[in-house]
Amino acid sequence: VNTVVSSNFIDKVRFRASAQTTANLSPHLFLKGYAAYGVRDKKWKYEGEVEYSFLKKQYSPEEFPRNSIAISTRYDVMAPSDAMLPTDKDNVFTSLKTQTIDQMSYFRQYNIRYVYEFDNHFGITAQLRHITQNPTGTLFYRTVGGQIVPELTQSEATLSLRYAPGEKVVVTKQRRHPVNHNYPIYTLMHTTGFKDV
């Protein structure tokens, strides 16, 4: 509900409708996505994801442990700082800002992710991602030599190892939330990029 209406510099007012399936439809196959429309730029934005869980789930694909593969695509507009938000970037409360954020970019992303979690809270995530970004608003990309670049493209592979002994979480429809912070979480991650892909 808190993402139905929001605002940013490019969209001005933004309307969004989201949907996702639960294990009530299928205990292995999960779909989720959204469609959003910006009143100022008159562009549709979207995200769609298909996730297959090799383990039977009671309600959500986020339930522990995970053994799943997901494929997603997304086209949207965002500020560079939106990638660091702990919540959804379309949360209506993120629209309340003390100053105008007008450096934004349209981005198109394709993602394949595999997650495997062991009973001892050790997990492995492997991911392939391709992103194209086009600056908008007052944002621009320039080479060291001063040439304006119309878009940035990055293709990358990430391998992440995570160990969270004693971790307890609450699973919501979209994500997990830790309920205890008494134990350490160890994460080792490596990302490598591919040139000219």
Label every model-predicted segment.
Residues 1-197:
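Exposed, low-structure sequence patches enriched in small/polar residues
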